Amino acid sequence: MTAAISFDNARSPDNALPLPAASTARVGVLLVNLGTPDTADAAGVRVYLKEFLSDRRVIEDQGLLWKIILNGIILNVRPRKKAKDYQSIWNTEKNESPLKTITRAQSEKLSAALADRSHVIVDWAMRYGNPSIKAGVDGLMAKGCDRILVVPLYPQYSAATSATVCDEAFRVLTELRAQPTLRVTPPYYNDDFYIEALAVSIEEHLKTLSYKPELIVASFHGMPKEYVDKGDPYREQCVATTELLRKRLGMDDTKLLLTFQSRFGFSEWLQPYTDKTIEKLAKDGVKRIAVVMPGFAADCLETLEEISGENCEIFKHNGGEEFSAVPCLNDSAPGMEVLRQLVLRELQGWL
């Protein structure tokens, strides 16, 4: 026999359960970028590269052969060369890389932009090097945060970037008995506020040039093609960003090119390659170009040395005449508006 149950008076105003009191704890926001050596010498670069290249998200095959290559060859040869590259862009005043300087500034400006929400605390960290994600989480908890929004500073998702930030953030939680609640912002590769900020930054930069570029190259960080073949959505998100940027700027695929930079090792990476494309453009008679790096939230070694330095030299050595790299969004007003909107959207329900 089925019993009839009345819900008419189950939650009348007189016997309704009281709403839980609003939390008086603070909410943390942790901006996270890739990382940087602590010093611009071979020793500092070696420590950084060992941590970076030992991450299974970055180099998926961490077998014996890779360990021999990494410890026997790469860490004995590459640090000296990369140290010179870092020295060429190093912030000597603060004795740190530009990436660290800019990420700190982004954190400070975002904190100021959220000043009317006094219970929100903003800090920053690096996936590799210092300050670490663990230090960031510990610091926010020490300031009374029981909820933390982790913000990977990568517009386009990749397992080698965004996912490893998540891995490390949640690994840190495994060491804690009293854990904060964690959220992670999603990729924002197709958000209107991001595309608009990119477009404005390009338009404003072009106004400062004494020439009109014949075309613009949009250069994204590369990755092994094998990773995409296995299901990483990174390439399709780079394509989506580029197509939206073309639409916003009124350019087609002959005027705004999509390329991939920073390949490493001997396997096939995503193509077309930035350096090969720029070399061919110059050899084909293109004299004036600009390069934008939409996937980088802050200028770093890959933008300041690889693009503004190496690729500029490649272009001019092969017949090009005018080359300019559009600064990343950094802590500019448009760049900070991207972070402000992203964070406020993802903090809904916590504020």
Curated annotation (Swiss-Prot):
Q: Which UniProt keywords apply?
A: Cytoplasm, Heme biosynthesis, Iron, Lyase, Metal-binding, Porphyrin biosynthesis
Q: Output one GO MF annotation.
A: metal ion binding
The record ties this protein, via InterPro entries, to: Ferrochelatase, Ferrochelatase_AS, Ferrochelatase_C, Ferrochelatase_N
Q: List localization entries.
A: Cytoplasm
Q: What is its EC number?
A: 4.98.1.1
Q: Which domain of life is it from?
A: Bacteria
Listed under catalytic activity are: heme b + 2 H(+) = protoporphyrin IX + Fe(2+)
Report the principal subcellular site: cytoplasm
GO BP annotations, alphabetical order: heme biosynthetic process
Q: Does the keyword Transferase apply?
A: no
Named in its record, the pathway it takes part in is: Porphyrin-containing compound metabolism; protoheme biosynthesis; protoheme from protoporphyrin-IX: step 1/1
Lyase: is it a keyword of this entry? yes
Q: Where does Fe cation bind?
A: H221, E302
SUPFAM superfamilies annotated for this entry? Answer: Chelatase
GO CC annotation terms, alphabetical? cytoplasm
* UniProt enzyme class: lyase
Q: What does the similarity note say?
A: Belongs to the ferrochelatase family.
What is the documented function of this protein?
Answer: Catalyzes the ferrous insertion into protoporphyrin IX.
Q: What PANTHER family does the database record attribute to this sequence? A: FERROCHELATASE (PTHR11108), FERROCHELATASE, MITOCHONDRIAL (PTHR11108:SF1)
Name assigned to this protein: Ferrochelatase
Q: What is the name of the gene encoding this protein?
A: hemH
